[in-house]
Amino acid sequence: MPNVGKSTLFNALLKRQQALVANYPFATIEPNVGVVEVPDERLNVLSEISHSGRIVPATVEFVDIAGLVAGAATGAGLGNKFLTHIREVDVILQVVRDFADSEIVKEGSVDPKTDYEVIETELILKDLETITKSLESKDVKAKGMEKKRAVVEKLFAGLNAGKPARIVLESDEDRELARDLFLLTAKKEILVYNVSETDQRLREPMGENLYICAKVESELSSLSAEDAKAYMLELGIKESGLDLLINKAYASLGLISFLTTGEMESRAWTINRGMKAPQAAGVIHTDFEKKFIKAKVCDYGKFVEAKGWKEASDKGWVRFEGKEYEMKDGDVVEFMVGS
């Protein structure tokens, strides 16, 4: 929805004024794209152990897209332009306003539930348009396409009943058969409530949804780490909402980090969850995958307790893993490759 704090939150993420923030609808027209560091305290600890010259965190890309209004599926507001932009992202981060402020322009009353339903309905309507065209296409009517047609028909019924595709598609097989339809409601979704700084939900453990005060996060992003910590303490907030958001987005994308550390740098490397050791080595350098021999691995906690590779090895905490090893988040690794 327009004027709910998306661009304020986006700018806080990037710690600079990149997206236009204005008190009128559709201040954002073209998408703003920013690459954000993934908070990872483990890198600071590893850097101290290894006396690293630098720290290189993992990153995730955020896109600030124009607000959607009722009727977007048929062209209202920025309509099809918005929907084209959202089709290009992997996870939808939906921001809804849940605070009162008479100075901020907003159509209707403050009702996050209704705002969420408006957005979800428009995405469902657009997907219905896609599915209707698919049902009429020769591809799903062709011989041998019975499974694909069954999934499309299932989607048509589910979407008509108001269910998003992510709920309708229950199995991995269904999701794979529907992949080339590029459905908007098949994407994973994170719901963020933009609340006031006095809202008690900011001070409670976060559940499935996130409660963030974009105004506070904007202020925190302009402060030094020490001043930001003091301000959060004053507000009674234990953890930055942005840190929670970034980590949740990273996990929702199905990503994890393995870690490398040495005098030159301590670094988090981004891989897909479930990736095997040779493919992970290939993220560092393509030749490493081809010439992979084995991976020297230590659990992060054990590595820190041992204060480095030598003692970890002496204590028997270092493992040598082969080509079938599935990487885990927080693995501290050195890859052994052939010449």
What positions do the PLM features span?
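Solvent-exposed, flexible loop/coil residues
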Residues: 25-33, 40-42, 47-53, 59, ...
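Short, surface-exposed linear patches
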Residues: 32, 56-59, 82-86, 93, ...
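Flexible, active-site-adjacent loop/turn segments at secondary-structure boundaries
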Residues: 19-27, 41-47, 53-54, 66-67, ...
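Generic signal for short, ordered secondary-structure residues
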Residues: 8, 25, 61, 110, ...
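Phosphate/Mg2+-binding loops and adjacent switch elements
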Residues: 73-190, 200
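C-terminal-of-GTPase-core extension/linker across diverse P-loop GTPases
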Residues: 1-4, 10, 137-328, 333-339
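Conserved G1/Walker A P-loop phosphate-binding module
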Residues: 1-103, 113, 120-122, 131
